[in-house]
């Protein structure tokens, strides 16, 4: 009867109080864990970026990651890490991205003073693991789609299926197009920011880098 109802109400209230307590404690713990891991994650990301910059524009004696420049093209913001040696500008690493088969493909591309590609590093991707690991090496020196030494200012990088000069990753034209788009865009950002004459990279208009319509992802 009434006693049982009261007991039930009382135990329900207790349960709510306990659950609320658990939620608050769990939330606080999560926040604490987030705080604990935030710094190491940020440090790991910073180290990964510094390592990638050293791969794509070797030979600098400054700290390019310290003060990146940003440039906006077509509503997209690009980060440019300038490399110098003995105070002389030797090139830059540009962070760029494009949408591949599974999502964003983030690439760091290194250019010398003239705008030639030195190397690249695939920072992150949402492709299937096989495609991602292929893209990480495919366009490197000695790879089937080697882009090193090429200058997108002289000729935009286009996959052979679209009449270009770059061999597509086996069975993945979409990932290849996305990658090359990211590289072309990186060059556009690189040449666009060099208004001070510190680079011999030819500024290119964005239209020059527009790929054939059938190649858009």
Predicted segments, located by residue:
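Conserved small/polar residues in nucleotide/adenosyl-binding loops
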Residues: 206-213
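Internal alpha-helical transmembrane segments
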Residues: 6-36, 40
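Alpha-helical transmembrane signal-anchor/signal-peptide segments
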Residues: 38-51
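Short, Lys/Arg-enriched N-terminal segments with co-localized hydrophobic residues
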Residues: 1-5
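Short extracytoplasmic
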Residues: 53-76
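Structured beta-strand/loop patches that form or line metal/cofactor-binding pockets in enzymes
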Residues: 76-108
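Flexible, solvent-exposed short loops/turns enriched in glycine
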Residues: 98-105, 113-172
């Amino acid at each position: 009867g009434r006693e049982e109802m009261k007991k039930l109400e009382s135990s329900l209230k207790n349960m709510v109080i306990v659950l609320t307590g658990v939620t608050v404690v769990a939330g606080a713990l999560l926040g604490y864990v987030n705080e604990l891991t935030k710094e190491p994650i940020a440090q790991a990301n910073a180290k990964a970026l510094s390592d990638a910059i050293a791969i794509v524009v070797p030979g600098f004696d400054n700290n390019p990651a310290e003060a990146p420049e940003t440039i906006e093209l077509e509503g997209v913001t690009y980060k440019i890490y300038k490399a110098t040696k003995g105070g002389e500008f030797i090139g830059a690493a540009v962070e760029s991205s494009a949408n591949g088969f599974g999502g964003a493909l983030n690439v760091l591309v290194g250019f010398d003073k003239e705008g030639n590609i030195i190397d690249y590093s695939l920072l992150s991707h949402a492709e299937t693991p096989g495609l991602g690991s292929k893209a990480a090496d495919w366009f490197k020196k000695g790879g089937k789609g080697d882009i090193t030494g090429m200058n997108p200012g002289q000729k935009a990088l286009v996959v052979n299926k679209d009449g270009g000069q770059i061999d597509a990753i086996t069975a993945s034209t979409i990932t290849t197009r996305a990658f090359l788009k990211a590289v072309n865009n990186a060059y556009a950002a690189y040449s666009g920011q060099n208004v001070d004459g510190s680079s011999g990279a030819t500024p290119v208009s964005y239209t020059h880098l527009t790929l054939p319509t059938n190649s858009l992802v």
